[in-house]
């Protein structure tokens, strides 16, 4: 009874804190409150509080249930939210350079935890005895590595998606302006009055706009470089976790079912996901390939992760259907 109450309290505290953090962060984006009262630093500290609350929640559930809390979808979602808070803390304690990981980790943590604690999963929060197939020491190794891999790959993929948005936003208006300018010059090619006006206008506005344009383009370039920097490193870390998780799962499957690989739906999609991110890392090793190409591959990987993570749970089929929606 005490453990249930403590788990309930920690769940609501962590969700409330991360909700406040997300609100503060969006306020800093809109009105730049961080320069006034330091709200931005407060939001980072809020994520740290959330991390300790979720850690306490997982330990409480571990002690109460007697097994590592990764036996159903609810527990895996809480663990996934915990992994996002870890990534946020790494970016928080890295004071050498400014990064924008908190724009990804804070919303991801609140959405995942909000879904886990919503009414959709109202039957899952109750801890249950493990089915015989899950009563193994490999549970902690395999599932924790897979969830950590999912968290890191999702975060890195979201950074790549942000890179694509900023890049295409940069290319689009530039292309439009070039075409409009070309049409204007062709139509007014022999209008010396218009040409004189353009020259005069450019000479007046040049000094006013050059500093602003340079600083804006430089900031955008720096932002794209930071997104690519963090995306590559976080995806690399997630790829390692995913690889270890797949290998440990193969060993566990051999002990349980007598075969290392059965082409189960979960195994198949995990292999497809692993292949996509292997292609991403291979592209990153080629310096002649633009960053936008690798970002597109990572964006595809983002969709595959959710298919791999939720696909079996939605269908409730295969050897990995424990804790699925339909099983409840």
Curated annotation (Swiss-Prot):
It holds the Pfam family Cytochrom_C_asm. It is found in: Plastid, Chloroplast thylakoid membrane. Keywords: Chloroplast, Cytochrome c-type biogenesis, Membrane, Plastid, Thylakoid, Transmembrane, Transmembrane helix. It comes from the Eukaryota. GO terms for biological process: cytochrome complex assembly. May interact with Ccs1. This is Cytochrome c biogenesis protein CcsA. The gene is ccsA.
């Amino acid at each position: 009874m005490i453990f249930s109450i403590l788990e309930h309290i920690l769940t609501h505290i962590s969700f409330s804190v991360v909700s406040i953090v997300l609100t503060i962060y969006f306020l800093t984006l809109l009105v730049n409150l961080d320069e006034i009262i330091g709200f931005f630093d407060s939001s980072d500290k809020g994520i740290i509080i959330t991390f300790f609350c979720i850690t306490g929640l997982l330990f409480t559930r571990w002690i109460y249930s007697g097994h590592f809390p990764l036996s159903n979808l609810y527990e895996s979602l809480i663990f996934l939210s915990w992994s996002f808070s870890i990534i946020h803390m790494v970016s928080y304690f890295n004071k050498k350079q400014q990064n924008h990981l908190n724009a990804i980790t804070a919303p991801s943590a609140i959405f995942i935890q909000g879904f886990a604690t919503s009414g959709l999963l109202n039957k899952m929060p109750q801890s249950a005895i493990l089915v015989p197939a899950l009563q193994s020491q490999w549970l902690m190794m395999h599932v924790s590595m897979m969830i950590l891999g999912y968290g890191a790959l999702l975060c890195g993929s979201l950074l790549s998606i942000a890179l694509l948005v900023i890049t295409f936003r940069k290319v689009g208006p530039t292309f439009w302006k070039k075409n409009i300018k070309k049409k204007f010059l062709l139509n007014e090619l022999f209008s010396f009055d218009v040409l004189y006006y353009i020259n005069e206008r450019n000479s007046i506005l040049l000094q006013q706009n050059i500093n602003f344009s340079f600083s804006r383009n430089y900031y955008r370039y720096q932002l794209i470089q930071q997104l690519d920097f963090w995306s590559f490193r976080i995806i690399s870390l997630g790829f390692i976790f995913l690889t270890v998780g797949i290998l440990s799962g193969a060993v566990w499957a051999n002990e349980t079912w007598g075969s290392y690989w059965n082409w189960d739906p979960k195994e198949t999609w995990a292999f497809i996901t692993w292949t996509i991110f292997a292609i991403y890392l291979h592209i990153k090793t080629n310096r002649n390939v633009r960053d936008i190409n690798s970002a597109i591959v990572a964006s595809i990987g983002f969709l595959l992760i959710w298919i791999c993570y939720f696909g079996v749970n939605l269908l409730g089929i295969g050897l990995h259907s424990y804790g699925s929606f339909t099983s409840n």
